[in-house]
Amino acid sequence: GKVCILGCGNGYDAILFSKKGFSVTAVDFAETPIHNLETNAKSLSLSIETIKKDIFDLTPNYSSQFDYIIEQTCFCAIDPLKRKQYSNLVHDLLKVGGKLIGLWMPLDKDIIDGGPPFGVKENEIKKLFSTKWKITEDCFPIQSIEARKGREKLIIFEKL
């Protein structure tokens, strides 16, 4: 399947999914992490499409292109006022039946405390993705790094 990783940073997820046989597109606006990912992918003989641009500039070129979008640290990094725009973006990028696989965090921080990372509330996420989506998974991850234990939740949304 085709995977898109928004706000990919150094691309550790991109490398993992590529090693598992997925076709990966990794997006970040920062030049250094994209360069690091390209260097690492090349050294591992992996083919990963990298895009250096703002995630909100991906449509219409990438509309309905992906089976999966991986969300880990992008949502909490963007301006909270753009969260509705983010939900529209991922809906547009995914094929019908595609999945937004999100590790949503930090759940224990309020938006008013600033960021990034900006606080994320479970009810806000579910409300944002309440129409045109169905939840297929909703749990605290079995494994979390110590600093994130209990502060992140795995919620997978399927595009209807």
Task: Go through the PLM ranges and name each one.
Residues I70:
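A conserved beta-strand element that flanks and buttresses the S-adenosyl-L-methionine
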